[in-house]
Every structure is written in structure tokens, then in C-alpha cells.
Curated annotation (Swiss-Prot):
SMART domains, A to Z: B41, FERM_C
Region feature Disordered, mapped onto this chain: 308-341, 376-418, 464-519
Gene symbol of the encoding locus: msna
Protein name according to UniProt: Moesin a
Disruption phenotype annotation: Morpholino knockdowns show intersegmental vessel and axial vessel tube defects from 39 hpf onwards resulting in disrupted blood flow. Loss of intersegmental primary lumen in intersegmental vessels at 32-33 hpf, vessels instead show a narrow and disorganized appearance without a visible lumen at 54 hpf. Reduces zo1-expressing tight junctions and cdh5-expressing adherens junctions along the length of intersegmental vessels during tubulogenesis between 32 and 54 hpf.
Amino acid sequence: MPKTISVRVTTMDAELEFAIQPSTTGKQLFDQVVKTIGLREVWFFGLQYQDTKGFSTWLKLNKKVTAQDVRKESPLLFKFRAKFYPEDVSEELIQEATQRLFFLQVKEGILNDDIYCPPETAVLLASYAVQAKYADYNKDAHTPGYLSNEKLLPQRVLEQHKLNKEQWEERIQVWHEEHKGMLREDSMMEYLKIAQDLEMYGVNYFSIKNKKGSELWLGVDALGLNIYEQNDKMTPKIGFPWSEIRNISFNDKKFVIKPIDKKAPDFVFYAQRLRINKRILALCMGNHELYMRRRKPDTIEVQQMKAQAKEEKNHKKMERALLEDERKKREQAEKEKEKIEKEKEELMERLRVIEEQTRKAQQELEEQTRKALELEQERKRAQEEAERLERERRLAEEAKSALLQQSESQMKNQEHLATELAELTSKISLLEDAKKKKEDEALEWQTKATMVQEDLEKTKEELKNKVMSSHVTEPVHGENDNDEGDESSAEASAELTSAAAYKDRSEEERMTEAEKNERVQKHLLALTSELANARDETKKTQNDIIHAENVRAGRDKYKTLRQIRSGNTKQRIDEFECM
């Protein structure tokens, strides 16, 4: 039995190990990878490797893995990457797994500065990346420093602004909060919708020369072929949509593109190496096929995938809605519980106050009762004293009467008796005064006792009312593989004609996400203003200067596309030859 070969395939978020046979083809390995990761939108992807000369190359699916220029090491190393890009991510990327792989690959390209991204857009994209990873911002879980170990911005952007790590985090965190309620997969899609408007997104650049020998860049992307000047990879000068191209071929380093327009001459350029022409041909064939496929009705398989994805998304939305409803109910229950606890505390405090008031009232009542008893005793004593004085007065009256009688009978002792009578009269007068005084005192004590009794009755009534009010009831709460050609082959060609989609150039009518989406537009304007004060103008790169000039001129990716495709094919080819 032949000895197996170890293979390691690295996707954007996983590392896979396989054992393959020496006879295993590129397609068999590719199929094994996509099956393992559960990917169905396979036409965008390919397996990339470094050949023995150190060049990055795509694995040919129709050849044995071992027959290709793969470095003989163990394990054999491959990267599973997007080889072709969609025109519109929101229309073409169906599966969540596909969306995630594109999101991670595009994010890596932006962070590595392979795709130029202006600072304000970089911060906004970073906030979507944070939402995709951490979900909704939570101040209790996402404490200061929660992004300190994350690479979220290109190094160029960090160096161009006088902001420290904490200040960058603060800005990203503010926009992270703005995305509350957005699903992780929706955050990734929002990231891609903005990123696809970046000028360098999805473009494969190749160094070429025209017949004059001018050094230029050829850009191959989902929409066609574009020509760039040597010092500007962001603003194409001439464009050819796939619908204008009939045939592409190369002979050694010479590459020939035949337009559909028979009046137009061939579009000829020269590459530095034969292998570059092979790669250009493969990319042209793949991108052209996808371009035409998009302009035809969806296949049954794609229709099924879209229906399934829609069903899964709706199911997730329902689950999300249920979870959100549960969260709201839980928050409401917590609020109710807090309210009940607060009401309970308030009631307990009121009860304590009432009890304190009752205790004080009871003390006052007892004091008043004691005073009332004392006053009653005083009254009784005064009354007894008055009665005693009354008795003494009567006795004095009787004595006076007796003395008068004696006075009549004993005239002899008249002087003596008169003196005695005067004394008794004086004594009687004093006793009457004392009696009157005691009667007045008794009356005064009687009045005081009556008032105390009334106060006592009033206090009893108040106490009764307070006790009644204290009984408060608490509330009840409740790929078509595109062979780049054999290394021995120095020429190849491919027919690209497809009359059905010749006139469909809807991409020229597109608008950027910022132009369509007012919310994104506002966010970008706010970020531009916010970062302006911290920007170090001395650290601007060539791309920054080009971008700023494009913004000032009112140009964007799609307006530029319309402009560079204007005029007939012949005019544009002539323009290319003059560059």
C-alpha cells in the first residue's frame, strides 16, 4: 500500500490536517477541505501554496497534488483562501460560513494595508469587527482595556494619529455601542458592504508594460480589467468590462485580449514572467465565468442554498427575538423586584416611625395620667381642708352664739367678753378668708383636672388613629478550475464570449454603501471630524494623498468605473497604448 502524505490546510480561522494518497488530485483535496468545513459556495475559493521558487501559487485542481511545484516538506502546507470576489457581498454570499471566511480575509488585507482604507473608515470597520466578536457592548463585561490585545486598525492609521491605546479604544467602544442589537453575522456583512467600496478591494495587481514600454499595473477583479499608472493603485485610468472581451491568450510574456467590438484593435501588454501570464489567464477565466453567471438566473443549487439560508436567518431572528423578549422580561422582573424591595424598605421605615411616635405618645399619655392623678389628689386635699375649715367656722359660730348669750347674761364681764368677742370675730373673719381661699384653690384644681381629662381623651383618640393607620397592607407581587497551464506550455488562450450578458453592465450604476446608507454616511462624517484634530499631516502616505484628492474631486470607486469605461473600446485601447 502506498505511503500516505501529510497535508496541513490553514483556513482563516482553523487548521486542518489530512493524510492523502500520492495519486490524490487537487480537486480531491479541495473537496475534502470544503466538506470538512461545511462550505457549499466553493466557486470563490482555492488552495494556495508557495512553490519551490517562493512564489505564491494556486493549486491546480485537475492535477495530482504531488505532480505540482509544491515544496517537498512534511506536512505539505496550503492556505484555503478566496480566489475570486463577489460583485456585491449582500447579494452573492449566501452561507454564513462563506461570509465569515470573506470577512476574516478582507479584514486581514485591511489590517496588513494590502487594501488601503482611510482612517475614519478603518475605525468604523473596527467597531463592526468588535460587534462580530463580542456581540452587544456591556459596560459590566467590557471594562476599560477589553480591546487592548486586539489588532483592529492598520499600523499606518495608528502612526498617523496622536492617540494612545486607551484613546483608540474609547473611540471604537463608542461606535461599538452604536451597533446594539446587531447579530454577529449581520455585523460581518455590514463590514464587507463598506469594505467592498474600497478601491483596492478584490483586485489582483500585475506589473505589465504596453507596446511603448511604459510600466503600468493591470488590475483583475470581478468586474473586468483595469489599467493603473505605476504610482497609483487606487485610481484606474482605463477599464474594460468582462462583457467587452471575446478572447484572451498569451504567447510567452505577450498577452493578447481580443474585444467583442470587431472594429477595435487587440489589447496587447507584456508581463515580466511567463508564470504571471498563466496566472492572469486563470484569473480572467474564473472572474469572467462568475461575471456571466451572475447575469443569468440562479441554478437550482443556488436557489436551494438561498432558500435554506433565508430559512436559517429567519429562524435565528426568531430565536433572537425570543431571547430579547426573555431579556426584557428578566430586566422588568428585576426592576419590579427592586421596586418591591424599595417599597418594603419604605414601609418598614414608616412603620418604625409610627412605632416611635406611638411609643412617645404612650409615654406622654402615661405622664399626663400621672399628672391627672396628682391633680385629683390635690383637689381632694383642698376639699377636705375646706370641709375642715367649714367645721371650724360652724364651731366658731356656735362659740360666738354662746358668747353672745353669755354677754347678755353676764354683763358684768362685758369688757372681758367684748374683748373676747372681738377676738372671736377677728378669728371668724380670718377663717372665712381661709375658707374662701381654699374653695378658690379647690375650684382651680377642679378646672385643671377637667382640662387634663380632656387632653387625656384627645391623646387617646390620636393614639387610636395612629394605631389604625399603621396596619398598612403590603402589595401582592408577584472553482470551474482554471488551469494556469503546464510550466512547459508557453502559450494558451480562452474564449470568453457570452452574448446573453453583453449588455448587462449594471455594476456601472452602483453606489457606495456610504452613499446609499445615511447612517453609515453620518458615522463616517463624525469620525472624519473627530480624527482631524489628532492627525499628524507629516505622516501622510502616497495613498492618503491620492485618496484625499479623489474625495475632493467627488470621485468614488463606481463613479471612476463609469468614467474609465466611457467611449468605445477602440478609444480606450488607443488611450492605453499612449500611456
